[in-house]
């Protein structure tokens, strides 16, 4: 576990000069909300539907003996991480929605291990579903989900958090990895 020594209840403070200079959008836009559309949950649901449709129309089975137990373990672990992350966000009284403005910088719970525990759990859920169902299509869809989540959500969320929390967020980024 990474020891993150940052004010656990950091309130928005402003922007760093470096972030303001690098950003391609006005800082006020970043400060209000990271994005207009809640991409990550939509991407997850779309990937599940695509995996089921592809598995039905073009079956490509996973047949190794431990696939189902491994898939179940990934799903349970992913759900537990999701619940833990959402509980940490709720405890800090900030939003769980990726398109809403964050009122607090959450650095405890699963956020002390990774800056994006919910998105990691989404990937785990997709991989677990593929293994549990014996459907190979979920594996490339999990990778696609992670890449699209990065480009459509994470980059903007990072700008939003930096615009709102400045040096505290930069210190958090130095202490905790984006993924794992």
Where are these regions (language model features)?
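Solvent-exposed interhelical
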Residues: 111
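Membrane-anchoring alpha-helices and their flanking helix-loop junctions
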Residues: 2-108, 120-180
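Extended, alpha-helix-rich binding/interface surfaces that flank or overlap catalytic cores
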Residues: 116
């Amino acid at each position: 576990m990474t020891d993150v020594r940052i004010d656990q209840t950091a309130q928005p403070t402003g922007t760093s000069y470096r972030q303001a200079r690098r950003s391609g959008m006005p800082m006020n836009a970043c400060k209000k909300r990271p994005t207009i559309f809640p991409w990550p949950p939509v991407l997850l649901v779309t990937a599940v539907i695509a995996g089921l449709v592809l598995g039905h129309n073009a079956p490509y089975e996973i047949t190794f003996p431990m696939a189902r137990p491994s898939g179940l373990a990934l799903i349970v672990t992913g759900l537990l991480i999701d619940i833990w992350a959402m509980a940490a966000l709720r405890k800090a009284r900030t939003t769980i929605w990726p398109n809403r403005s964050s009122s607090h910088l959450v650095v405890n719970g699963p956020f002390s291990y990774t800056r994006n525990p919910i998105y990691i759990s989404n990937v785990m859920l997709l991989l677990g579903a593929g293994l549990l169902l014996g459907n190979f299509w979920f594996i490339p869809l999990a990778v696609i989900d992670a890449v699209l989540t990065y480009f459509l959500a994470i980059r903007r969320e990072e700008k939003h958090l930096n615009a709102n929390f400045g040096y505290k967020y930069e210190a958090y980024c130095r202490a905790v990895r984006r993924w794992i």
